[in-house]
Amino acid sequence: MIEKDLLEGMALIDDKQYSVPRYHFTKAAAYAFATRFYLFKRQYAKVVEYASKIFPNNNIVSLLRPWNSEYRILTYNELWSRYAKATEPANLLLVETVSTWARNYIGVRYGLDAQKSNEILLAPNVTGGTRIFRYQLYTGGTNNYFIPKVNEYFVRESINAEIGLPYVMVPLFTTEEVMFNRAEANVFLNNINDVVNDLNAYASTRIYNYSASTHTITAGKIRSFYRTSDNQAGALQAVMDFKRAEFVQEGMRWFDLLRYKIPVVHPTYEGPTLTLKADDPMRVFQIPDVAKLAGIAQNPR
């Protein structure tokens, strides 16, 4: 049903109807959704097909966020202002919603502590260079780190009101995700050269003082870094590592946890570690009560 709706709806989209396309479900947004959908279905050739519609001339670099150039010199307020703008080529679909996410993701419960920031953002990577995120990592309090991405805008109930609602503008689909989806699909199609090409395009915008002569990724470099003789296993790990760092604190990691049945492990400040196993039914959201009243069975718990 989802696939049928996707394909039929895609043919009906007319981008000319929108003065600000990125606030609407355009063809590019539909193609991005298709890459995510077919990745879950393991129809990898279709992932590559739809991703390539977004990069028709393989012009990946010009459509990725310029983290190691333009973004590098921005203040955190400027980053917050730019990350979710409709003029940012990397944003394919932006949606506003009432949320306190922007004020909470730098806090204790949702924060990135020193151990995790070292593991995800600061540890060595296959290029041999330093991720640019090191230089845009800010502290939100003791042992809480964040990268300025999605900012809050507060809408008052009236001009003179002291109360209102917090909103955020969320990038639901981005060119970075599309690129990673294509790279992952090419791993399983055993198109390792294509995987490496995408990762090199990405790395050229994410490595501090990037130099092709020093930081170019090769299949041999991947095997050596991940200590494997299996090109596919190494390439998949490289894709996952870059993707994890790219979307830190955005929630995109959840899709990978689902596809690869990875347990969720959360150390707590008090000491105990909380684990959500790969087969735990709590990993599936509960059916809303309204739907239950309509006769839809709830998910097991």
Question: Which residues fall in each region the model found?
Answer:
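Acidic/polar-rich alpha-helix caps and helix-coil junctions
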Residues: 1-101, 125-301
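Eukaryotic alpha-helical solenoid repeat scaffolds
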Residues: 107, 111-112, 167-170
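Short Lys/Arg-rich basic patches
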Residues: 120-124
